[in-house]
Swiss-Prot record:
Enzyme Commission code(s) on record: 2.7.7.6
The family this protein is said to belong to: Belongs to the RNA polymerase beta' chain family.
Source organism: Chromobacterium violaceum (strain ATCC 12472 / DSM 30191 / JCM 1249 / CCUG 213 / NBRC 12614 / NCIMB 9131 / NCTC 9757 / MK)
Pfam families: RNA_pol_Rpb1_1, RNA_pol_Rpb1_2, RNA_pol_Rpb1_3, RNA_pol_Rpb1_4, RNA_pol_Rpb1_5
Record's function text: DNA-dependent RNA polymerase catalyzes the transcription of DNA into RNA using the four ribonucleoside triphosphates as substrates.
Protein name (Swiss-Prot/TrEMBL): DNA-directed RNA polymerase subunit beta'
């Protein structure tokens, strides 16, 4: 028996390994893998179905076809194991060796490996320093290459055509050697002296100054040094021996009717073998050179096709004209080995079915159909049946189950008890898309799902399906129960707020029962406790919304932390009193003593979670759900056409709007406004009118007149069904009601521009044919967008996951005191995100000091919880420096302190949490949701009416920011003449309360130091044009304003009036006029040019492209007057269509087109001599060095002569380039920019995401650095390397008193960052598999399997979560350490060598 068991042990060979290394295999290595040479192209004998000898399926080379049986049948059975049959030469062993044994083909002529040739940049070209074109000409026998010039004047590696070669042969005879084909290239590679070459290149690097040359040399040096370091020889890039894949991996399957289905690889191999054999024969026959050459070329081509079909020339096709699938195709792409089989596997023990509502379930339960449970838990049931003695064998047990005898159901109940199952709904966009539940057996065939978890799964019951998986092992069950059970996932990992929040009917029911009503039945009654209230309600003495007084028992904690009852009297309503029964201990009644809307309920659950803990919260949420359902049923809230009340003032408002539009049309006819302005103003009027009607409608809907107890008429909140649905947040929104009962409003065209004719009707009145037709535009765009954007969003998530997948919390504290300073986020002066929300759940980096007393209130390294945040709030602290993922010093991971609170658990994050993936999911998940949001409003244009003034929101003192500059015009108004001016309002304590940007050309309504009340107008402006304003008075003198050259006279057909418009230089005729810049000089009374204050340069004001000039030559102008105006483009509707690509653009770190410019240094601005299309701006720093910037003339310069700018300040208008921010302002400014921009997109959609997640991704975008000076290290200048590697190397250098490397930060887009990761397995499974593997092989890269993805691919536990412990213990055993020492991610000892 023991021998029999040993037998099985032999078969499974497991290799323990800690790293995987990839390299180029030498010919000897390939021969050592091989079990024999494949000499014939035959596969299987079509009569006997036995593999042909020496063919592609040969049993002698690859192993027996049947287990323990040789081919001729002489040896059968186990006892002959390991014998080699003398007749057929087959070893008697398991047939599965046919999956592992390789063969080889000895090539008659060397061939180049196409990956090293054609995968850009060509590695062969790099090593030989020849162009790809030249190498190809040699390889494919179009040219000779000189491999040994001898005494002749020819160059080494010189190419010769056929004629050249013959000439030279006549001339020099045998003096020189020239060859062609792969032999030639191989010869060149052999002659390459790596050491000397590297030495030469290093010398050249030091002497050369040209940037392009440095780059080129560095690249070549990198490749050569890789060869030198790894001990691989460059000539191995040329194949002499071709390995043959084991036959079971390229099977040949007989179909019925005597035909065979075969893998394409067999065809490709057959061609190689055929051509190879033919070439051997030709060489033996000493065939003419040209024939041999042709055959060699064909051999090279067939090997190319085998390795990577279609990379060079046309792809080889099979019988049915489709390209054959080569080895490279097998591993790359979505259907390749990596993504199809290694990263995504299918699992057993699963079922799927439609889901329905389970309103009676508890939060941790799901309803599982009996039939399904029986199938899923079969093995457990079999076991139980045997144990109980009801069945003696598995077969018998199976029979019992099939007959469904009553005992089986009892056993099923028992087996299922406390055995959680996993439910999953595709698409699984974040980790809450898979949760564990305890199954409850139900009749029917649909799975029942608890309504409160629908939000997490994004599920609804309109036919969604879900999959069930059964965790089998004890560990799996334990993990499912502790980590994945629905009750343990109350908070969303994206923002730390509850995700089990009641919605729809539940909200409606709770809202209905907590509303109050004037003069309800039994108003003013007083009750002793809630039981009395219940009785009164049941006996119909009071209504649900009646206002009453009731005495309630509340629980408050005393000093010992014990709950003590406290009796209080409350003025409340019947419904609220009844609801108070389900409040958990320690939650005050005032939290529900109001009309509960969706937001309030969410807050309620949040407060409950923080105060009462997870257990009570879950029970409370369940109770809320039952109550909500019950009372929404009692409420009987329905919808009826009469509920949609059309406002009385509608026709009046429409009349006014039409009148205004007519006026504007009139102005347009008189030429007072341009076409664009007219359009903008009309759209604006209709936008405003729509809002007014909506407001009037909401006012009428939301109030109703009733009589109170005294018989007086009072307003009370309406009980209109539609209003209640929208107000409670159960269904619908103001925007939707506006379309039902107000007016539909403006519609957008598919390109986003707004149609200026609004739809004045609403759905209740019905639309005319034209209105209906206009609407179809927007509605259809919504549907088309959805389809396209779902894919984009999924791709964004995939890239995010890939860039962050190896980021795991691996230690408690990295000990840094770096961090970012957090302030409240202001936009347009409003606080959109308070400081408290930004620092909640973060760890302080430095002590927090009370500004009034100067004492430390919170020490550094403290996790900010709700109490501490309140403290910061109450002390009026404006900014707090907190730790962040970006500045964490942990290498190959992150520390818990820099990350802070685990949002989904509400406490400090645990080691092993895969925060990278969580961040990626949190950012990617809403992307998909948002993409599907467009069509809910049915394409109605939602756009804010253009802002034309700015108001102060608080009382205080006005202060102008340091950049603010203004002039007083002739009317005494203050006109702003800077683009970066801000009005700041300070409160009595001198703290900044708000900051308002004021645009160029605005009229200020306040002065510096003025006291204002909230709501005061600070400045006004025309929103539809940008003015060009003069700061000086004088007489206008035009220069270069030449009609037909630089400006065009535009006559309006309607009005017959003409204006001058500046023409775009690109559109101007003649090269002279392209150079000219139309501008204005000002003359004083004596006719001299007015000079700039404090300098002798004269004032010149340039007109930008598209400016409409409003002054005439020779006209007198005063300060602050408008010389020209530039019409603003009509605004488009903003929705996430702009949003999703915007997020992708930020994370890809793309430079925006026509980006603005930032000042490179701090200094003084001056203008130099202009060139053809550019103006020259010079910044002179304090040392007197000038830095020149050439700026295209159509760009808008934000600075003026003599202005002092700081490094990193904006000098040319336009979107900023994140790379510039990093270079000039540093990491913190860059992080702030990306976080703010990304957040803005999500905020627009009302999605909350914690900044942490974005920071985690920015950390990954910054993980590479560029070496600026290599010091004594092995790095090459200009090389990109992992930050962690540089830091480690520098530590080593410092320890040995050597010169460390200098580096600068570099920002990589997420795709680039994923591909440039150290792990080649991870990169190859992401994108561009061929390129990644080629590079890795040349570099002889070694993958230490640090990330999650690499470990999934090699099939072991991931180093995160519970898998982290497994990896830690494995490392310890390998290094023989005590259990005490934690060696987390140290270099692994033995690497698995695959190709030395």
């Amino acid at each position: 028996m023991k021998a029999l068991l040993d037998l099985f042990k032999q078969v499974t060979q497991e290799e323990e390994f800690d790293a995987i290394k990839i390299g180029i295999a030498s010919p000897d290595k390939i021969r050592s893998w091989s079990y024999g040479e494949v000499k014939k192209p035959e596969t299987i004998n079509y009569r006997t179905f036995k593999p042909e000898r020496d063919g592609l399926f040969c049993a002698r080379i690859f192993g027996p076809v049947k287990d323990y049986e040789c081919l001729c049948g002489k040896y059968k059975r186990l006892k002959h194991r390991g014998v080699i049959c003398e007749k057929c030469g087959v070893e008697v062993t398991l047939s599965k060796v046919r999956r592992e044994r390789m063969g080889h083909i000895e090539l008659a002529s060397p061939t180049a490996h196409i990956w090293f040739l054609k995968s850009l940049p060509s590695r062969l070209g790099m090593v030989l320093d020849m162009t790809l074109r030249d190498i190809e000409r040699v390889l494919y026998f179009e040219a000779y290459v000189v491999t040994d010039p001898g005494m002749t004047p020819m160059q080494y590696r010189q190419l010769l055509t056929e004629e050249d070669f013959l000439d030279k042969e006549d001339q020099y005879g045998e003096e020189f050697v020239a060859m062609m084909g792969a032999e030639a290239v191989k010869e060149l590679l052999k002659k390459l002296d790596l050491d000397a070459e590297i030495e030469g290149l290093r010398r050249e690097l030091e002497t050369t100054n040209s940037d392009t040359k440095i780059k080129k040399i560095a690249k070549r040096l990198k490749v050569l040094e890789a060869f030198q370091r790894s001990g691989m020889k460059p000539e191995w890039m040329i194949l002499e021996v071709l390995p043959v894949l084991p036959p079971e991996l390229r099977p040949l399957v007989p179909l019925d009717g005597g035909r065979f289905a075969t893998s394409d690889l067999n065809d490709l191999y057959r061609r190689v073998i055929n051509r190879n054999n033919r070439l051997k024969r030709l060489l033996e026959l000493r065939a003419p050179d040209i024939i041999v050459r042709n055959e060699k070329r064909m051999l090279q081509e067939s090997v190319d096709s085998l390795l990577d079909n279609g990379r060079r020339g046309k792809a080889m096709t099979g019988a049915n004209k489709r390209p054959l699938k080569s080895l490279a195709d097998m591993i790359k792409g979505k259907g390749g080995r990596f993504r199809q089989n290694l990263l995504g596997k299918r699992v057993d023990y699963s079922g799927r079915s439609v889901i329905t509502v389970g309103p009676t379930l508890r939060l941790h339960q799901c309803g599982l159909p009996k039939k399904m449970a029986l199938e899923l838990f079969k093995p457990f049931i079999f076991h139980k049946l045997e144990v109980m003695g009801l069945a003696s064998t598995i077969k018998a047990a199976k029979k019992l189950v099939e007959q469904e005898v009553p005992e089986v159901w009892d056993i099923l109940e028992e087996v299922i008890r406390e055995h959680p199952v996993l439910l999953n709904r595709a698409p699984t966009l974040h980790r809450l898309g898979i949760q564990a539940f305890e199954p409850v057996l139900i009749e029917g065939k649909a799975i029942q799902l608890h309504p409160l978890v629908c939000a997490a799964f994004n599920a609804d019951f309109d036919g969604d399906q879900m999959a069930v998986h059964v965790p089998l092992s004890l560990e799996a069950q334990m993990e499912a129960r502790t980590l994945m059970l629905a009750t343990n996932n109350v908070l969303s990992p994206a923002n730390g707020e509850p995700i089990i929040v009641p919605s729809q009917d539940i909200v409606l029911g709770l809202y209905y029962m907590t509303r109050d009503k004037v003069n309800g039945k039994g108003e003013g009654m007083v009750f002793a406790d809630t039981k009395e209230v219940h009785r009164a309600y049941e006996t119909r003495q009071v209504e649900l919304a009646t206002r009453i007084t009731v005495r309630l028992k509340e629980w408050e904690k005393d000093e010992q932390g014990e709950f003590q009852p406290v009796i209080k009297r409350y003025n409340t309503t019947v419904g609220r009193a009844i609801l108070s029964d389900i409040l958990p201990k320690g939650l005050p009644f005032e939290h529900i003593n109001k009309a509960l809307k969706k937001k309030e309920i969410s807050k309620l659950i949040n407060v409950s979670f923080r105060r009462c803990g997870i257990r009570d919260t879950v029970i409370f949420a369940d109770q809320l759900m039952y109550t909500g359902f019950a009372y929404s049923t009692r409420g009987g809230i329905s919808i009826c056409v009469d509920d949609m009340q059309i406002p009385v003032k509608k026709s009046e408002l429409l009349g006014e709007a039409n009148k205004e539009v007519k006026e504007i049309e009139e102005q347009y006819r008189q030429g007072l406004v341009t076409q664009g302005e007219r359009y903008n103003k009309v759209v604006d009027i209709w936008g405003r009118t729509g809002d007014k009607i909506a407001k009037a409608m909401m006012d009428e809907l939301s109030k109703q007149k009733v009589l109170d107890r005294e018989g007086k008429e009072v307003d009370q909140e309406s009980f209109n069904s539609i209003y209640m649905m929208a107000d409670s947040g159960a269904r619908g929104s103001a925007a939707q009601i506006k379309q039902l009962a107000g007016m539909r409003g403006l519609m957008a065209k598919p390109d986003g521009s707004i149609i200026e004719t609004p739809i004045t009707a609403n759905f209740r009145e019905g639309l005319t044919v034209l209105q209906y037709f206009i609407s179809t535009h927007g509605a259809r765009k919504g549907l088309a967008d959805t389809a396209l954007k779902t894919a984009n969003s999924g791709y964004l998530t995939r890239r995010l996951v890939d860039v962050t997948q190896d980021l795991v919390v691996i230690e408690d504290d990295c000990g840094t005191s770096n961090g970012f300073t957090m302030k409240a986020v202001l936009q347009g002066g409003d606080v959109i995100e308070a400081l408290r929300d930004r620092i909640l759940g973060r760890v302080t980096a430095v002590d927090v000091v009370d500004p009034s007393t100067g004492e430390t209130v919170i020490e550094a390294g403290t996790l900010m919880d709700e109490h501490l945040v309140d403290l910061v709030d109450s002390l009026g602290i404006d900014e707090v420096k907190v730790r962040t993922a970006i500045t964490c010093d942990t290498r190959y991971g992150l520390c818990a302190k820099c990350y802070g609170r685990d949002l989904a658990r509400g406490k400090q994050v645990n080691a092993g949490e895969a925060i990278g993936v969580i961040a990626a999911q949190s950012i990617g998940e809403p992307g998909t949701q948002l993409t599907m949001r467009t069509f809910h409003i049915g394409g109605a244009a939602s756009r804010n009416a253009a802002a034309s003034q700015v108001e102060g929101k608080s009382n205080g003192t006005v202060r102008f920011s340091s950049q603010m500059r203004y002039v007083a015009n002739t009317k005494g108004e203050l006109i702003v003449i800077t683009r970066s001016g801000e009005v700041v309002i300070h409160d009595d304590m001198g703290r900044e309360r708000e900051r308002r940007k004021v645009p160029y050309g605005a009229t200020l309504m306040v002065t510096d130091g003025l006291q204002i009340k909230a709501g005061a107008v600070l400045a006004t402006w025309d929103p539809h044009t940008r003015p060009i304003i003069t700061e000086y008075a004088g007489r206008v003198k035009f220069e270069n304003v030449e009609e037909g050259n630089t400006v065009a006279k535009q006559t309006d057909e309607v009005t017959g009036l003409s204006t001058l418009v500046v023409i775009d230089p690109k559109r101007r005729a003649g090269s002279q006029s392209k150079m000219l810049r139309p501008l204005v000089k000002l003359l004083d009374d004596n006719g001299n040019e007015v000079k700039l204050a404090g300098s002798d340069a004269s004032v010149s004001i340039t007109f930008q492209v598209g400016a409409i000039i409003t002054v005439r030559d020779g006209q007198d102008v005063g300060k602050g007057e408008v010389l020209a105006r530039i019409p603003q483009e009509s605004s488009k509707t903003r929705d996430i269509t702009g949003g999703l690509p915007r997020v992708a653009e930020l994370f890809e770190a793309r430079s925006p087109k026509d980006a603005g410019m930032l000042a490179e240094v701090t200094g003084t601005v001056s203008f130099g001599k202009d060139t053809k299309g550019k103006q020259r701006l010079i910044i002179t720093d304090l040392e007197g060095n000038g830095y020149e910037n050439l700026i295209p003339k159509d760009k808008h310069v934000l600075v003026h002569d003599g202005q002092v700018v700081n490094r990193g300040e904006s000098i040319v208008d336009g979107p900023v380039d994140p790379h510039d921010i990093l270079r000039l302002q540093g990491i913190e400014a860059l992080a702030r920019y990306i976080v703010q921009e990304v957040q803005e997109v999500y905020r627009l959609q009302g999605v909350k995401i914690n900044d942490k997640h974005i920071e985690v991704i920015i950390r990954q975008m910054l993980r590479r650095v560029i070496i600026t000076d290599s010091g004594d290290t092995e790095f090459i200048q200009g090389e990109q390397v992992e930050r962690a590697d540089v830091l480690e190397m520098n530590d080593k250098m410092m320890a040995e008193n050597k010169e460390p490397a200098q580096y600068e930060n570099v920002l990589l887009g997420i795709t680039k960052a994923s591909l440039s990761t150290d792990s080649f397995i991870s990169a190859a499974s992401f994108q561009e598999t061929t390129r990644v593997l080629t590079e890795a092989a040349i570099m002889g890269k070694r993958d230490d399997l640090r990330g999650l993805k690499e470990n999934v691919i090699v099939g072991r536990l991931i180093p995160a979560g519970t898998g982290l412990a497994y990896h830690r213990t494995r490392r310890r055993q390998n290094l023989g350490l005590d259990a005490g020492e934690s060696m987390l991610f140290d270099p692994a000892p033995a690497a698995l060598e695959s190709g030395e």
